[in-house]
């Protein structure tokens, strides 16, 4: 009995050590931003985005608290084979008070298996909800290739000259499928699937690589239900991206072409089972970030996007912007962001334009333009001149001449745009990723 009692503390100590080691192996990653701001004419901070543009210049122009909290762990490993469990809980609130009710969203819940197929060394197998190989422009928070969602796939298959990835993901619409239930017309959500194939790591020149992608999206109505007449049932997206290393940074040049339902979000997610989005989209994009030396760094973007819809409800969007950074010390810097957006309506022929300039003093954890966490104080000036906008559901109620989601010119009776105005905002913000 005494021998058993002496062994018990030793067993408990070993178990505690094992549990502690496992707990320390949990990966905690994430992103967050939050702050406080005011508008020169009074009230809380306003944020500025050109009507018809898909994004806005974000420095000193974010009016919400947003966070992504990621927990993950390698739960099994044997040799070079392993399983990794990954999660991501995200939320967004308007940062107006201490307690703000919010329903968090599980953006990611997936398992990734590495080297599980003997004849495909280095390949990863995965299933679940996932941020899948997203491509974005950070300074305008613009995701131009993003099929994230529930799905499954096989990635990083080494072909010798490049790496092949294949996946299927899903992003469904709230309605769009019509049928009859008990002899009454019934509308149900429509499943939208995207089938994605990518070939990456193609070496074209010293320091330069090419990635090619093909995405096919389709609406998948359940048995006994069909899509609305004229709805966009499917579409394609073709992407070519060249990445060039420059000093300690990079430049990315992107060409994209989309058809029909893939012109709805223009990022690889198809949509349109409830609307007619048949047509085509062409995008030419160049963006990058470079740390030139210990004093200077810069982000930049220039893009042309043309959406030509069969229903004449497309648009042409130009945007160009820069964000130079001067580093006073390894942890203190000054940033100036200047951006211009111009959006022409295919239906009205008129343009909406906006200039936005932000000056920020920043303290960050390091001397790179990517160093975070950062605390910044900022002042923003925006000026816009708009002549058209999209009708809302409330606009269309009781007015048979208007259709929600359709572009219209401003008139003396109704204003759809923000008009012609300017504004100043100022405040403080923190931003972190880890």
Curated annotation (Swiss-Prot):
It catalyses: beta-maltose(in) = beta-maltose(out). The keyword Iron does not apply. Keywords: Cell outer membrane, Ion transport, Membrane, Porin, Signal, Sugar transport, Transmembrane, Transmembrane beta strand, Transport. Induction: By maltose. Residues 1-25 form the signal peptide. It is a multi-pass membrane protein. One of its GO terms (biological process) is monoatomic ion transport. Transmembrane segments: none annotated. The record marks 31, 66, 99, 250, 370, 433 as: Greasy slide, important in sugar transport. Its main location: membrane. The record marks 143 as: Important in sugar transport. Homotrimer formed of three 18-stranded antiparallel beta-barrels, containing three independent channels. Belongs to the porin LamB (TC 1.B.3) family. This is Maltoporin. The lineage of its organism: Bacteria, Pseudomonadati, Pseudomonadota, Gammaproteobacteria, Enterobacterales. The gene is lamB.
């Amino acid at each position: 009995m005494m021998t058993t009692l002496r062994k018990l503390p030793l067993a408990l100590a070993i178990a505690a050590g094992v549990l502690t080691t496992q707990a320390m192996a949990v990966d905690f990653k994430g992103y967050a931003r939050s702050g406080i701001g005011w508008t020169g004419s009074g009230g809380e901070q306003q944020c500025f985005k050109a009507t018809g543009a898909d994004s806005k210049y974000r420095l000193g122009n974010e009016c919400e608290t947003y966070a992504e909290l990621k927990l993950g762990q390698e739960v099994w490993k044997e040799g070079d084979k392993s399983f990794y469990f990954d999660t991501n809980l995200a939320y967004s609130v308007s940062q107006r008070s201490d307690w703000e009710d919010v329903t968090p969203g599980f953006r990611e819940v997936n398992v990734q298996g590495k080297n599980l197929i003997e004849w495909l060394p280095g390949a990863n197998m995965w299933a679940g909800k996932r941020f899948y190989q997203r491509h974005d422009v950070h300074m305008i928070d613009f995701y131009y290739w993003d099929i994230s969602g529930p799905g499954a796939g096989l990635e990083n298959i080494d072909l010798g000259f490049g790496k092949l990835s294949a996946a299927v993901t899903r992003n469904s619409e709230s309605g769009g499928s019509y049928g009859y239930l008990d002899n009454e017309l019934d509308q149900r959500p429509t499943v939208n699937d995207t089938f994605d194939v990518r070939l990456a790591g193609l070496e074209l020149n010293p320091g330069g690589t090419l990635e090619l992608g093909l995405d096919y999206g389709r609406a998948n109505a359940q048995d006994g239900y069909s899509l609305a007449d004229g709805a966009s049932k499917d579409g394609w997206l073709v992407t070519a991206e060249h990445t060039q290393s420059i000093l300690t940074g990079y430049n990315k040049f992107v060409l994209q072409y989309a058809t029909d339902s893939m012109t709805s979000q223009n990022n690889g997610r198809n949509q349109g089972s409830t609307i007619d989005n048949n047509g085509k989209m062409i995008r030419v994009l160049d963006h990058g970030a470079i740390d030139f030396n210990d004093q200077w760094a810069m982000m930049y973007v220039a893009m042309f996007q043309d959406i030509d819809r069969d229903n004449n409800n497309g648009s042409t969007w130009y945007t160009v912007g820069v964000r130079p950074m001067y580093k006073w010390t390894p942890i203190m810097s000054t940033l100036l962001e200047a951006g211009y957006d111009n959006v022409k309506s295919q239906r009205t022929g008129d343009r909406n334009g906006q200039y936005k300039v932000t000056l920020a003093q920043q303290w960050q954890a390091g001397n790179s333009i990517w160093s975070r966490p950062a605390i910044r104080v900022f002042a923003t000036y925006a000026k816009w001149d708009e002549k058209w906008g999209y009708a809302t559901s409330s606009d269309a109620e009781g007015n048979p001449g208007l259709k929600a989601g359709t572009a219209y010119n401003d008139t003396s009776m109704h204003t759809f745009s923000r008009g012609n105005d300017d504004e100043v905002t100022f405040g403080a913000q923190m931003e972190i990723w880890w």
